[in-house]
Amino acid sequence: AGGARAHTGQTSTLDPRGEHLVCFTGGMFALGGKLFDVPEHVEIGRKLTDGCIWSYRALPLGVMPEVFHMIPCKDRTDCKWNETLWRSEASNRQGLSTDLELDAYIKKARLPKGFAQISDPRYILRPEAIESVFMMYRITGEEKYQDAAWEMFSAIIAASQTDIANAALSDITYSREQLESEGVDIRMDSMESFWMAETLKYFYLIFSEPDILSLDEWMFNTEAHPFRRNLPG
């Protein structure tokens, strides 16, 4: 996934940019596919959601960055890991010319494999990824989504908890060992209201019984407020 820029002549250019904010699209596709009986859209939703879960697991703190770039697959059906391609893309994005320069950049930026660039390494307690994980669990009943949710919750709490609340994080590319050895505190003096209104709500609901705010009877608006559906009869 990413952004696309349309040009004259019916051509377009893909910008392989990922954003935590866009992780809601997995749940959107899956829910629409389920409601309108379009299995292909449910599968698209699964792939998008699984990609966001992977983005959490790929970072040392287990938390996904705000904005990043990756390497698009040249073939949707055959996309094997290619370290040479990754290094080339990371080098090109920084305008580097030698392997020594690239190695130094990867070390300094703490760049995980697969990420060509992390342009915004913050995590601001966003809800979009767990929103889609919740939707996928309710739609499919697959327990792997509960497992992923618990991993995400545990990682976020471990990194963000303070004496009084939870804090946004300024740079999630550090490992816990690096934070301790370098004496760095990435917790910011900020906690958006959506942390409690949305993020924690979806974490709570994915471990609740399915009849609590069932998707058959309720819908959630953009800010995760539930509204009862006006069903026939």
What role is predicted for each listed range?
Residues A1-G233:
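Glycan-recognition and catalytic cores of secretory/periplasmic carbohydrate-active enzymes
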